[in-house]
């Protein structure tokens, strides 16, 4: 009776924890909406899927919803969404032991999602952009200092940094006359760009002011382009030789014979267990560059200043061994629980023990999923152009270019006010 109650309780827990969040199909549909530049449809789809995020990952829901904004279709609730996501991330530091244990036994989804270091950095970036769109310079400065503090701690604790965010902060500090802070951030940006040279991102050329430019203002256009990769779950059956599990191949694991796999999936092979590992899924995009026009005249081409695809892959590679070990520990825990329950049942009836083995093996196989959560609506890259423009209202156009510099589309801002000696920011989100 004792083992029967334990088995029933364990099965119930598994079913409760089997939720895996938004599906791959859902993500593809949202991405499709964004690639068609139909951000209203993407927002509606995300809102309809709020329950699939659950309370546990509400921060990702708010982030995916907020990432549909730019200077053309900016919504006043963007700051509310971003602030809610930030507050929920801060609350995650009070994590219970029971959640941690469940993540070992069931799957990684039992714990709330904590943003990766680069995702947290770009949460600050999006909030600053929102403040700039609302012309709330004071709060934009406060958020910039918060972002820089985060980057400083990140560098001290891990040696990591984000060159673009440091550069972005330096430009904002210049805007407010905080020259010492601007100099420090610029130096950090230069060092970080050197360390991330293989990302192909670089700092934009410095805008040179001359005596003739005294009646001009600085315009910065940021082009948030493409879609960052996301993760999918790959499930494999691993054979156990008395608690040994084979790790080989360049992928960090090896699958067993197909006959064993088939039997294990049927719950009939007691010494095999499901292990799910994440895999990077890239999202192709056509736009490879962009060109800035002011009043119909070409003035600049954008520079790749941040490669978020690179950051995503680099972070995944750095975490893969940890993911692999966690998956192995979880698989071992499931294996031991299954065998313990089976042995307990065998003391009363061998047939019941065999059935217990089949039930638990099948149940653990069904609930085994890799943690594939991420802020999947982030751009793949950020491009930037800076140009000095005479004071007054201007027509600003950004042409989207393919790899052969053919114009695929364009985005227009009418009557953009440029003020003498001031810095104006515009940003556009494209995904095609």
Q: Model-flagged regions — what are they?
A:
Residues 79-90, 145-149, 172-197:
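TPR/TPR-like (Sel1-like) alpha-helical repeat modules
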Residues 15-41, 48-50:
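Bacterial Sec signal peptide processing site at the extreme N-terminus
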Residues 39-40, 75, 82, 137, ...:
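TPR-repeat structural position
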Residues 23, 56-59, 113-121, 161-163:
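Start-of-helix signal in alpha-solenoid helical-repeat scaffolds, especially tetratricopeptide repeats
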Residues 28-29, 63-64, 68, 119-129, ...:
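"A position-specific structural signal for the A-helix of alpha-solenoid helical repeats
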Residues 54-59, 88-99, 153-160, 190-208:
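Boundary/linker segments of alpha-helical solenoid repeat arrays
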Residues 208, 214-432:
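Short loop/turn and low-complexity linker motifs enriched in small/turn-promoting residues
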């Amino acid at each position: 009776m004792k083992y029967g109650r334990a088995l029933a309780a364990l099965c119930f827990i598994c079913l409760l924890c089997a939720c895996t969040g938004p599906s791959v199909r859902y993500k593809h549909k949202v991405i499709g909406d964004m690639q068609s530049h139909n951000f209203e449809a993407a927002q509606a789809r995300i809102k309809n899927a709020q329950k699939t995020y659950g309370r546990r990952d509400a921060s990702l829901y708010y982030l995916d919803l907020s990432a549909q904004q730019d200077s053309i279709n900016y919504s006043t609730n963007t700051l509310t969404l971003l602030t809610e996501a930030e507050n929920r991330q801060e609350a995650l530091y009070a994590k219970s032991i029971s959640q941690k244990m469940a993540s070992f036994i069931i799957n990684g989804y039992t714990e709330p999602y904590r943003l990766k270091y680069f995702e947290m950095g770009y949460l600050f970036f999006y909030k600053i952009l929102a403040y700039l769109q609302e012309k709330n310079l004071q709060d934009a400065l406060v958020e910039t200092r918060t972002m820089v503090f985060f980057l400083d701690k990140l560098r001290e604790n891990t040696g990591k940094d984000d060159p673009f965010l440091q550069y972005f902060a330096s430009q904002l500090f210049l805007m407010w006359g905080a020259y010492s802070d601007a100099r420090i951030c610029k130096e950090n940006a230069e060092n970080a760009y050197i360390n991330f040279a293989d990302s192909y991102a670089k700092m934009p050329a410095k805008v040179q002011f001359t005596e003739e430019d005294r009646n001009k203002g600085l315009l910065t256009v940021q082009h948030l382009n493409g879609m960052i990769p996301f993760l999918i779950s790959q499930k494999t059956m691993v054979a156990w030789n008395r608690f040994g599990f084979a790790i080989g191949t360049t992928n960090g694991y090896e699958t067993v014979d197909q006959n064993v796999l088939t039997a294990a999936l049927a719950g009939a092979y007691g010494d095999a267990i499901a292990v799910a590992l994440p895999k990077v899924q890239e999202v192709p995009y056509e736009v490879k560059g962009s060109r800035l026009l002011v009043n119909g005249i070409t003035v600049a081409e954008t520079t790749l200043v941040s490669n978020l695809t690179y950051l995503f892959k680099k972070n995944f590679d750095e975490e893969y061994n940890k993911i692999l070990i966690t998956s192995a520990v979880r698989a071992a825990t499931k294996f031991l629980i299954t065998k313990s329950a089976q042995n307990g049942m065998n003391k009363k009836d061998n047939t019941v023990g065999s059935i217990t083995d089949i039930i638990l093996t099948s149940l653990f196989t069904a609930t085994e999923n890799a943690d594939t959560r991420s802020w999947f609506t982030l751009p793949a890259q950020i491009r930037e152009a800076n140009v000095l423009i005479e004071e007054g209202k201007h027509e600003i156009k950004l042409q989207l270019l393919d790899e052969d510099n053919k114009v695929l589309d364009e985005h227009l801002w009418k009557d953009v006010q440029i003020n003498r000696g001031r810095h104006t920011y515009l940003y556009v989100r494209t995904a095609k």
